[in-house]
Amino acid sequence: MGVSKKKSGEIRGDLIPGLPEELAIECLVRVPFQFHSSIKSVCRSWKCVISSRSFIKERIGFGKAESLLCLVQPLTSPPSPAMMEGGEMSQKKKEEEEGESQMTQQLLQPRITGTPLYGLSVYNATLDTWHRVAIPERIPLFCECVAIQDAGKVLLIGGWDPETLQPVRDVFVLDFFAGEGSGRRFRRGRPMSAARSFFACASVGSTKVYVAGGHDDQKNALRSAEVYDVEKDEWSMLPPMTEGRDECHGFSMATDPGFCVLSGYGTETQGQFRSDGEIYDPITNSWSTIENVWPFPDLSPRGRTAAAAAEFPGDFRGCRLWCFIDSERQSQPHWEVEDDSMKWKVIMDTIRLPVTTMTSVFAGSLSGQAVAMIGGGGEESGTMMVKTTAEKNGGKWSHVNTPSGFSSLPFSCSSIYV
């Protein structure tokens, strides 16, 4: 088993008296995430096991991990105690009260007229519940949300200052596998070297997050890129991209540690999305170009593309993406493109959304399923829908119960198992 007595001799005696360690682990992995805070206090051995990084792998292996979708979205109303309490987001009572009080004060503080307050919402797809994370300070508008599964962390990066509406360098780290409290801890990370918003962002490997492009405080499209090591809390600069790319979208290149920046537009061509992308190779420390990968000059890839579940053998070097399109838009159902180095490939499959072109949508992926939050004035407005894509016929869209406090269209999202 992955969790054992090997960890510096911290675990002594039986985890559960009278049971072999393997059976004891099988019992512990079945405890819902919301109770991990409580069972960590039972004994040192249990705390050591549940706080270890290998414990989540055991939960995934036994099919007991809970799938969370984290969304950065405008707050439509002050969070009620019901939204802040219970489930996997619960804390000790004192922490709950402090978090609620701080968030309420944030909502009451004066801001620029018309500027929404953003929050981090969490949908537990396993339990079909919604919660909002109590964060001790305001998070930036339009910040990027990215998860690093192996590290058990969700990061909020960049965006706009809610007071000045200027791009920021901020990094916030939410640790779901923290050793104390509810099993999550919130802190500030080291800021980026450059302030940016509307940029490409993706986790690559077990500890790294790459960012590239976006725009600065003068709305200039950026070529710059950098990488964050979440364990070392350090940023390192990368070579700049060939082109400045605002409103671009980022992806990990699946089996290899590459980083793909999809589409975007230049300073002088705002709103005209490029058909190409760029891929960073950490082995050569260089960028290559991939042509004809985004065929929609009038459509941003943000909220319309997501990483699909891997279905390719180990020799596949690149990424497979879902492209979410309106029911009325013309498009190929599938296309494949290689970069100019002939090393990387991007495979794109289209998924038809249950909406028309007049509806606002933010789409992504969650546990191998397509997921879409629907906005605008359509019939399905304010709801989330999921589609099981593994079925031969492509599956059907189905509704997710979405409380009114969580119905606003998100800006970014990421998913993580706990």
From Swiss-Prot:
Presence of keyword Nucleus: yes
CDD domains, A to Z: F-box_AtAFR-like
Main location: nucleus
Keyword Secreted in record: no
Ranges occupied by Kelch repeats: 104-150, 153-206, 208-255, 258-314
Entry-linked Pfam families: F-box, Kelch_1
GO biological process terms held by the UniProt record: negative regulation of cytokinin-activated signaling pathway; protein ubiquitination; regulation of phenylpropanoid metabolic process
Name of this chain's protein: F-box/kelch-repeat protein SKIP20
Gene3D superfamilies named in the record: 1.20.1280.50, Kelch-type beta propeller
Gene Ontology cellular-component terms listed: cytosol; nucleus
Domain F-box: 14-61
Region (Disordered): 79-104
Annotated function: Component of SCF(ASK-cullin-F-box) E3 ubiquitin ligase complexes, which may mediate the ubiquitination and subsequent proteasomal degradation of target proteins.
Domain notes: The F-box is necessary for the interaction with ASK proteins.
Superkingdom in the source lineage: Eukaryota
Disulfide bridges in this chain: none
Subcellular location per the Swiss-Prot or TrEMBL entry: Nucleus
InterPro entries associated with the record: F-box-like_dom_sf (IPR036047), F-box_dom (IPR001810), Kelch-typ_b-propeller (IPR015915), Kelch_1 (IPR006652), KMD1-4 (IPR044595)
Quaternary structure (record): Part of a SCF (ASK-cullin-F-box) protein ligase complex. Interacts with SKP1A/ASK1 and SPK1B/ASK2.
Record SUPFAM superfamilies: F-box domain, Kelch motif
Keywords from the named record: Kelch repeat, Nucleus, Repeat, Ubl conjugation pathway
SMART domains tied to this protein: FBOX, Kelch
Pathway field: Protein modification; protein ubiquitination
